[in-house]
Curated annotation (Swiss-Prot):
This is N-acetyl-gamma-glutamyl-phosphate reductase. It comes from Burkholderia cenocepacia (strain HI2424). It is found in: Cytoplasm. One of its GO terms (molecular function) is NAD binding. One of its GO terms (cellular component) is cytoplasm. Keywords: Amino-acid biosynthesis, Arginine biosynthesis, Cytoplasm, NADP, Oxidoreductase. The gene is argC. It comes from the Bacteria. The keyword Oxidoreductase applies.
Amino acid sequence: MSFPTVFIDGDQGTTGLQIHARLRDRTDVRLLTLPAAERKEAARRADALNACDIAILCLPDAAAREAVGFIRNPAVRVIDASSAHRTQPDWVYGFPEMADGHAHEIAHAKRVTNPGCYPTGAIGLLRPLLQAGLLPRDYPVSIHAVSGYSGGGRAAVDAFESGDAAARALPLQVYGLALAHKHVPEIRQHAGLAHRPFFVPAYGAYRQGIVLTIPIELRLLPAGVTGERLHACLAHHYADARHVDVMPLADARAATHLDPQALNGTNDLRLGVFVNANGGQVLLSAVFDNLGKGASGAAVQNLDLMLGARHAA
């Protein structure tokens, strides 16, 4: 019996290493790997890209575009973990739970672009509410998120874990101060927003895990929309989702904090709705592993869908 062959182009980066770890002991796929001395040789990479059934690209954006250009075999399918193709119309966006039937679309796609880590939480919260008409498309969305330092890639991990004093000097590092983070167009397009969201990301002095929050003013929503209706919409949308759950309102009322590391090592996404009815305010939240549902876990979930595993979504 032959098994599908998977080639991870860029398997020594943060995401590539995680995907390799998730696949190496599986018996239903065969990993195609290159010797260390050949990993950066264009000709050898091109050979591997054309010899596999599914290529997973864990590369910087320019290198990912180059890798796609190397592929001449029309049978090769691609999952791109970079941000190079996330807003391209000829690529399927790899967030299975974001819409009815989307997992089926991924399962039959030739080209799948893995979502960014922050967009996973933002789109997961916003898209169902926008689709239901509970949140206007022109709502002035503000997104605040804190990720573990692994969100900065291999260089950030090496800096923090080597004891680099400068890297570890601040417990929290807010960045993207030009308000032009590369995830903004992705969030706007796939959430369905009419305008650019305001996005402020930060890195914390811990390895992995994200807490993302979006404040909502109920007075800016259509008449009759309450925090409870926002929660009910999300709960209904994700009722059958294997990897997304919505915190019950009672649990949200009892919560005193959100732990960004709570879902580390999983491919799960936990959404929350915190309501101050008297103040007319709601806080939407998403907690997940930036290396799990925000990267490698999502890639493997998409791979499983492309291989025909119905349980993956």
